[in-house]
Regions:
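Short beta->alpha connector loops
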Residues: 3-6, 58-61, 82-85
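Conserved beta-strand segments of alpha/beta enzyme cores
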Residues: 20, 51-53, 97
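N-terminal Rossmann-like dinucleotide-binding module
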Residues: 1-34
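N-terminal glycine-/serine-/threonine-rich beta1-alpha1-beta2 phosphate-ribose binding loop
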Residues: 27, 31-73
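A structural microfeature
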Residues: 23, 56, 143-144
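Amphipathic, non-transmembrane alpha-helical secondary structure
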Residues: 8, 12-16, 66-70, 88
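Donor/substrate-binding cores of folate-linked one-carbon enzymes
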Residues: 17, 27, 76-168
């Protein structure tokens, strides 16, 4: 489950390492520009290139979506910047649980925009935390932390690029 470029590296790694990625969940296509042409999320683009089923719920809590997801009988869900909170019914669904890859050194900068806040606040370090998800917002048991030192000239864009590689 993921949406922006930050999540694409993780999806590619899963595919390249021969994991059986049977479906991808991403945000619905969004209209862009004056023509309001629908644009795929970066994660959907990668999934389509790899012939992976794509699910795009308006709301992750919708019962029809939850039931559709249940049909996959997944061992694990990997969540990277999906953009919606998952209900307990989804978190508890896979046999091995849900793993979240978050772009901060948790517990600092839970939720949205952690990369930008690390730069705005002038942090000396940032990183990527991999955790087992629970019902809270980025509050699950921490499994792995990858720490990186920020450059004095670090921008949100440069840190995004660095952390997306680390997170993959």
């Amino acid at each position: 489950m993921g949406t922006p470029d930050f999540a694409v590296g993780t999806l590619k790694e899963l595919i390249d390492n021969q994991y059986d990625v049977v479906a991808v969940v991403t945000q619905p296509d969004k209209p862009k520009g004056r023509s309001k042409e629908l644009v795929f999320s970066p994660v959907k683009e990668e999934a389509v290139k790899n012939n992976i089923q794509v699910l795009q719920p308006e709301r992750a809590r919708d019962e029809a979506f939850v039931e559709e997801l249940r049909k996959y009988n997944a061992d694990v869900f990997v969540v990277v910047a999906f953009g919606q909170l998952l209900p307990k019914s989804i978190i508890d669904m896979p046999r091995l649980g849900c793993i979240n890859v978050h772009a901060s050194l948790l517990p600092k900068y839970r939720g949205a925009s952690p990369i930008q806040w690390a730069v705005i606040d002038g942090c000396e370090y940032s990183g990527v935390t991999t955790m087992k998800m629970d019902e809270g917002l980025d509050t699950g048991d921490i499994l792995l932390v990858d720490k990186v030192k920020l450059d004095k000239k670090e921008t949100g864009g440069s840190l995004f690029d660095r952390l997306s590689i680390v997170g993959a």
